[in-house]
């Protein structure tokens, strides 16, 4: 589950929000998809995400929520997908996390398989509105929406929001690190736990971005001319660069969290 937003505060301490789904207001789709975000460019180059993300709002609009402030500006949105976790040959949350749950969800939709679980996909907050608890409010609205559609569990392949500050820390260690009060060290994991979730497992290969060295140079502004691990701003783990093969690969780990409703 991706969480994105900057740190600039351009609003007062209290934000009055109106939250709706795209089923209720389909005319808002382009504005929702066009809302500002702070995703690192390379993150948007995941081929699975590129093939499926925009389809959520087109084919599953009841699972896309957005928030408007008192001026009618869209300040946040949340995407989720229903899927059949307990279908044959599944049953366990996938190691390929975010990518695979998107594939499962649209495969189920295409084949008419009845879903039994909702997976969070993203919560995005406009950089100007960050710092007012919107991520927690959108997560709560996503939980309520899943419950209203008859589901008893939301799962989330969570992208820890501060992991990029420690790209060499093993994800297993990071995911289970807690503060003295027992809450997770990571801010985004902490929001989920406060909402009622529990850490379930690591998704070691939740998202994969591969590209030529020229592409990685364009995406990051870094030289990508030396074999080995390259630290990229915003990346949770180093990117593996192999100049002799002319390519580099980023395999992002996430943390599976489970919300009982």
Task: Report residues per predicted region.
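N-terminal amphipathic/basic-hydrophobic helices that include classical n-h-c signal peptides
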Residues: 1-14
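Conserved acetyl-CoA-binding loop of GNAT-fold acetyltransferases
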Residues: 193-201
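Conserved acyl-donor/pantetheine-binding loop and adjacent beta-alpha core of acyl/acetyltransferases
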Residues: 79-122, 160-185, 203-247
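Short amphipathic alpha-helix that is part of the acyltransferase structural core
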Residues: 11-97
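Short beta-strand-to-coil "C-cap" segments at the C-terminal boundary of structured domains/repeats
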Residues: 258-261
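ATP phosphate-binding glycine-rich loop and adjacent ATP-lid/helix-beta elements
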Residues: 189
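Conserved acetyl-CoA-binding loop-helix of GNAT-fold acetyltransferases
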Residues: 125, 131-148, 153-156
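Short hydrophobic/aromatic beta-strand element in the GNAT-like acyltransferase core
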Residues: 62-66, 77, 117, 122, ...
